[in-house]
C-alpha cells in the first residue's frame, strides 16, 4: 500500500521522480510497474473554491475503475454526473511507467490542472497515490482539519 508523504520538485518540462517506496509498492503490492495518472477528485475548500491534484492508480486498479465507470449502473450517479467524472478523470488519464532511474513525465495538461510548478508532494493514500503542488496541499490539508470527523464512532471502531 502507498503510505507517507514525499517532497520533491518538478522541472519545467514536467520531469520528476516517483518515490522509490512507491515504485516498490507498484511492483510488490500490485504486480505491475505501470500506472495511470490523472486528475484527482476536486476538494471543496471552505472559501467556496476548489483544489485539485493528480492521482496515480496502479495499472489493474485503474482498469477495474474504468470497468465500473463504463457500466455506470449502481454507482448512484446521474448521467450528467457520470459524464462529468469521465471527462474530469478518465479523459485526461495517461498510462505511465518510471524509467530505470525512477523518473516520470507529467504531461502539460495534467501539470496545468494541478497547478504543478516547482515544489510538489507525493502523498500515499493506500491503494493509490496523489501528487500535489505544495501550495495546493497546504490548502487541502487545512480543509482536512475542518472536515475531520472528530469523535466519530467509525474512527473509534478503527482504533483511530
Swiss-Prot record:
Record-linked PANTHER family: TRANSCRIPTIONAL REGULATOR MRAZ
Subcellular locations according to the entry: Cytoplasm, Nucleoid
GO annotation terms (biological process): negative regulation of DNA-templated transcription initiation
Ranges for domain SpoVT-AbrB: 5-50, 93-136
Gene3D superfamilies referenced in this protein's UniProt entry, alphabetically: Transcriptional regulator MraZ domain
Record InterPro entries: MraZ (IPR003444), MraZ_C (IPR035644), MraZ_dom (IPR020603), MraZ_N (IPR035642), MraZ_sf (IPR038619), SpoVT-AbrB_dom (IPR007159), SpoVT-AbrB_sf (IPR037914)
Record-given protein name: Transcriptional regulator MraZ
Assigned keywords, A-Z: Cytoplasm, DNA-binding, Repeat, Transcription, Transcription regulation
Amino acid at each position: 500500500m502507498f503510505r507517507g508523504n514525499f517532497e520533491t520538485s518538478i522541472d519545467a518540462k514536467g520531469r520528476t521522480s516517483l518515490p522509490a517506496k512507491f515504485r516498490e509498492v507498484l511492483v510488490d503490492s500490485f504486480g505491475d510497474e505501470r500506472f495511470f495518472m490523472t486528475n484527482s477528485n476536486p476538494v471543496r475548500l471552505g472559501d467556496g473554491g476548489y483544489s485539485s491534484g493528480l492521482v496515480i492508480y496502479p495499472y489493474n486498479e485503474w482498469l477495474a475503475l474504468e470497468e465500473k465507470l463504463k457500466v455506470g449502473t449502481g454507482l448512484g450517479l446521474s448521467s450528467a454526473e457520470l459524464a462529468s467524472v469521465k471527462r474530469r478523470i478518465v479523459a485526461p488519464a495517461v498510462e505511465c511507467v518510471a524509467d530505470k532511474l525512477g523518473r516520470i513525465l507529467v504531461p502539460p495538461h495534467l501539470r496545468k490542472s494541478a497547478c504543478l510548478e516547482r515544489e510538489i508532494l507525493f502523498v500515499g493514500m493506500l491503494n493509490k497515490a496523489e501528487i500535489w503542488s505544495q501550495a495546493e496541499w497546504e490548502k487541502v490539508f487545512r480543509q482536512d482539519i475542518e472536515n475531520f470527523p472528530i469523535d466519530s464512532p467509525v474512527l473509534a471502531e478503527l482504533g483511530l
